[in-house]
Amino acid sequence: MKPDAHHVKQFLLRLQDDICQTLSAVDGANFVEDSWRREAGGGGRSRVLRNGGIFEQAGVNFSHVHGDAMPASATAHRPELAGRSFEAMGVSLVVHPHNPYIPTSHANVRFFIAEKPGADPVWWFGGGFDLTPYYGFEEDAVHWHRTARDLCQPFGDDVYPRYKKWCDDYFFLKHRNEQRGVGGLFFDDLNTPDFDHCFDFMQAVGNGYTRAYLPIVERRKAMVWGERERNFQLYRRGRYVEFNLVWDRGTLFGLQTGGRTESILMSMPPLVRWEYDWQPEAGSPEAALSEFIQVRDWI
């Protein structure tokens, strides 16, 4: 089947609706929608839930941008895209809970297609989801990865280990020499064996996110926390900001190509702190995190 961008867009719009409705039902607060247009072509729907019962901030963004030509920064590494019109669309979300015992989660699914008359379209899917705990609970990481493995299984035995490793490699802070969290799935440039297969996989990842995350939220939301845990959460959120602004390709591409800044930076935590050369107390739960987020096989 030839690539069907309209079909993908309809799925992404439904996915945004479904995730927002599910998160609202769990939290009790509603998302506020901000629809926006891009002068050069396209637009999107940014939805944010703030100061809810469970989530300090949750942002779920849909975007669909298009144009007659790719920016030079995008074609430098992919010369086959030069001179083609393009469409890029996706859903991206980040959830920052109040409770430090609930991890932060991130998910993204996207589709890109570039076309010109007389030539086959160039297209691919990308996406994934990853988990960033502040306090490590093995059963949470195991559930997260088991859900990821199970949704990958129908697409081949090698899919989960391959995309799990890609996620571990991608969400790594080189300047800190540490992982961002316990990983999950990450894939990009997916265009084989055919459109239907790739689209099915992207849908499985998008639909799998809430199954992976919400049982963890339910398990941790009643845990009692205080100033110590909150300060550590804010300190560790600093790593999240550092990764997004220094290493994340999507953030950098969006900012460098004139994307909508408010939507791009919607992933940022609402509050964060840095402290010079801070070290956790030896033997403390805070000190245990650095070992917990080391790359390992969780299942």
Swiss-Prot record:
Instruction: Name any Gene Ontology BP term.
Output: protoporphyrinogen IX biosynthetic process
What EC identifiers does the entry list? 1.3.3.3
Q: What class of enzyme is it?
A: oxidoreductase
MF terms from GO for this chain are: coproporphyrinogen oxidase activity; metal ion binding; protein homodimerization activity
Binding positions (a divalent metal cation): 96, 106, 145, 175
Q: What does the UniProt entry say about where the protein is found? A: Cytoplasm
UniProt feature coiled coil, ranges = none
Which residues are catalytic? 106
Question: Which top-level group of life is the source organism from?
Answer: Bacteria
Q: Which reactions are catalysed by this chain?
A: coproporphyrinogen III + O2 + 2 H(+) = protoporphyrinogen IX + 2 CO2 + 2 H2O
Family according to the record: Belongs to the aerobic coproporphyrinogen-III oxidase family.
PANTHER family in alphabetical order? COPROPORPHYRINOGEN III OXIDASE, MITOCHONDRIAL, OXYGEN-DEPENDENT COPROPORPHYRINOGEN-III OXIDASE, MITOCHONDRIAL
Note the subunit structure: Homodimer.
Spell out the protein name for this chain: Oxygen-dependent coproporphyrinogen-III oxidase
